[in-house]
Every structure is written in structure tokens, then in C-alpha cells.
């Protein structure tokens, strides 16, 4: 695969060109990135070290934390580096790698959220058959679908964008390489390509969102026959998941289900779904899940006891 242009690098304008603001941006996003990574490590260590969290539901949560950490790592380190050193140039291949990473991990996360909704449906509506339905083979198959779906989605996007001729300005008014800013720099008519890309991203977003809505409608209908305590526990789990779904899908639909014109609000929206949401996900699932909180307390108590010895 070979691109048809002589463009070797792009210039990312970032969030601001004000030196004082760049220092503030460096501190803020460095803290956000540290919280994201620490949240991922905390969740994975807690689930791995706690036998009570060995169900597929918590395995999916560990995968979600891993994907969030990777998703945030695609753009956040670059933004931090650019804010600290003022380096704005990014090589063409580096830009394409960013685009691929964004859509690989973003696509995988969208599919995983749908898988988690199915898992919640089975746990709430068919509790006696949960471990039979969500056996190791099914879990492995679903995780395979998550990764292959993300890879296929990202590959389609990168094949479209890599072949575009770039022969004019190379300045991107964004803090990351993304489809819409790149389409605006192409030296050709990109109208049909915009439709293909919107269809690809839109299909992923809308299909997963529709499946999620159906899952939760069925879950809510089935809760009418459950006890009050069971309803409260199920709703607590579902509210956490629905919150994460809204935080992830609404910004993505806003960005990718419209023409490629770049809007001033795009940077803020991109920050939200590529950095803020991955940071919030571990907090949302931990604070809303009694089993996770108890497991973290036990893990901390165990470390305190071993430290005293």
C-alpha cells in the first residue's frame, strides 16, 4: 500500500499557542493520563487477585480498562509532549498510526460495551444459566469479536485515508490526527469518501447503540418480576454501564455522523471521548459497584497486613 503524495509531515496546532496555557494543559492532561493508567492497574490487579470477581462480567471490565488505557495512550502522550516542548510536527506515518490506533481501540470499546450489555442481560434475566451461557468458549469468542471488529473498522478507515493525495497546506487545526481534519487537507474531491467513512463509523456507532438500547429495554422489562433488593443491585450495575455508554457514544456520533467540516467544538468533544471518558470509566464502575469496592478494600487491607509483618 503506497500513498500518492509527497507530504512527509503534518503540523498539529494543538489546543492553544499561548505558552502559559500550554503549561497548564501539560499539567492537567498529565494528571488525567496518570489517573487513567492508575485506574486501569487498580481494576486489573483487584480482579486478578480477587476470586469473588472471577465471573465474565468482571473479565469484561478488566478488558474495558485495558482498552481505555490504550485508547488514551494513542493521543494523550503526544498532547503532553507537544504542550511541554512546543513540538507540533508529526510524521505522515505517525499521523496514520494515530488514526489507526484511535479507530482500533475506539471500535473495540464500542463493541465491548455491547458485549457487556449482553452479559448484564444474561446475568439479570437468566441468572441460573449464567455460567452455562457465558462459558469460557463463549467469552473467548466474544473477546475475539471485540478485537477483530476494532481491527476491521480501523483497517477500513486507514485504507480510505492513506490513499488520499496531500499536496497543499499541512497544518491541522487539532491536537491529534483524525479523519475530518485530514479530509479537509486532501487535494481532491472527498465527498464520496466522507459518505463511506461516515457510513463505516456510523454503522459501528448506531448498530452498537441500537443493540445496547434493546438489551436494556429487555432488562428493565424483566426487572418487574424481581425482588426490590435484586432490582436495586441490577439497576446499580446497569446505571454504571449506561453512563459509560452515553459518555462514549454520544460524542462519537456527533463527530462521525456529520459532514467532514471542522467545527470549533470538535477539539473539546475529542478530548472528552478520547481522554476524559477513559479516565472516568474506572471511577464510575468502581464507585457504583459494591463488590469492586469491597474487593479493593480487602486488597488494601491485605497489603497493610503484609506491610506490618
UniProtKB/Swiss-Prot annotation:
Major localization class: membrane
Keyword terms: Cell membrane, Disulfide bond, G-protein coupled receptor, Glycoprotein, Membrane, Olfaction, Receptor, Sensory transduction, Transducer, Transmembrane, Transmembrane helix
Gene3D superfamilies for the chain: Rhodopsin 7-helix transmembrane proteins (1.20.1070.10)
InterPro entries given in the database record: GPCR_Rhodpsn, GPCR_Rhodpsn_7TM, Olfact_rcpt, Olfactory_Receptors
Extracellular side: 1-23, 68-103, 163-202, 258-266
Signal peptide: none
Disulfide bonds: 95-177
MF terms in GO: G protein-coupled receptor activity; olfactory receptor activity
Superkingdom, natural source: Eukaryota
Compartments reported by the entry: Cell membrane
Residues passing through the membrane, by range: 24-44, 47-67, 104-124, 142-162, 203-223, 237-257, 267-287
Glycosylation sites: 6
Membrane topology note: Multi-pass membrane protein
Cytoplasmic side: 45-46, 125-141, 224-236, 288-309
Coiled coil among keywords: no
Gene Ontology CC terms, in alphabetical order: plasma membrane
Keyword hit for Cell membrane: yes
Family indicated by similarity: Belongs to the G-protein coupled receptor 1 family.
Task performed by this protein: Odorant receptor.
Name by which UniProt lists this protein: Olfactory receptor 4C46
Species name: Homo sapiens (Human)
Amino acid at each position: 500500500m503506497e500513498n500518492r503524495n509527497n507530504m512527509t509531515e503534518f503540523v498539529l496546532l494543538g489546543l492553544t499557542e499561548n505558552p502559559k496555557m500550554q503549561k497548564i494543559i501539560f499539567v492537567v492532561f498529565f494528571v488525567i493520563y496518570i489517573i487513567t493508567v492508575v485506574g486501569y492497574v487498580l481494576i486489573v490487579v483487584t480482579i486478578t487477585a480477587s476470586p469473588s470477581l472471577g465471573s465474565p462480567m468482571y473479565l469484561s471490565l478488566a478488558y474495558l480498562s485495558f482498552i481505555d488505557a490504550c485508547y488514551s495512550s494513542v493521543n494523550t502522550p503526544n498532547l503532553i509532549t507537544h504542550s511541554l516542548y512546543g513540538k507540533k510536527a508529526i510524521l505522515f506515518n505517525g499521523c496514520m498510526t494515530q488514526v489507526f490506533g484511535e479507530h482500533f481501540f475506539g471500535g473495540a470499546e464500542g463493541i465491548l460495551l455491547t458485549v457487556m450489555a449482553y452479559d448484564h442481560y444474561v446475568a439479570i434475566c437468566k441468572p441460573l444459566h449464567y455460567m452455562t451461557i457465558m462459558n469460557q468458549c463463549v467469552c473467548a469468542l466474544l473477546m475475539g469479536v471485540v478485537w477483530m471488529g476494532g481491527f476491521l473498522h480501523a483497517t477500513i478507515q486507514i485504507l480510505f485515508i492513506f490513499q488520499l493525495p496531500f499536496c497543499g497546506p499541512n497544518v491541522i487545526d487539532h491536537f491529534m490526527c483524525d479523519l475530518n481534519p485530514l479530509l479537509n487537507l486532501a487535494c481532491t474531491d472527498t465527498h464520496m469518501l466522507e459518505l463511506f467513512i461516515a457510513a463505516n463509523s456510523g454503522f459501528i456507532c448506531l448498530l452498537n447503540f441500537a443493540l445496547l438500547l434493546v438489551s436494556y429495554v429487555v432488562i428493565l422489562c424483566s426487572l418487574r418480576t424481581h425482588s426490590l433488593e435484586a432490582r436495586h443491585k441490577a439497576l446499580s450495575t446497569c446505571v454504571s454501564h449506561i453512563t459509560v455508554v452515553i459518555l462514549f457514544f454520544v460524542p462519537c456520533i456527533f463527530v462521525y455522523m456529520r459532514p467532514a467540516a471542522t467545527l470549533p467544538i470538535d477539539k473539546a468533544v475529542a478530548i472528552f471521548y478520547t481522554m476524559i471518558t477513559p479516565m472516568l470509566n474506572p471511577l464510575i464502575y468502581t464507585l457504583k459497584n459494591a463488590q469492586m469496592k469491597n474487593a479493593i478494600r480487602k486488597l488494601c487491607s491485605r497489603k497493610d497486613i503484609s506491610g506490618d509483618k
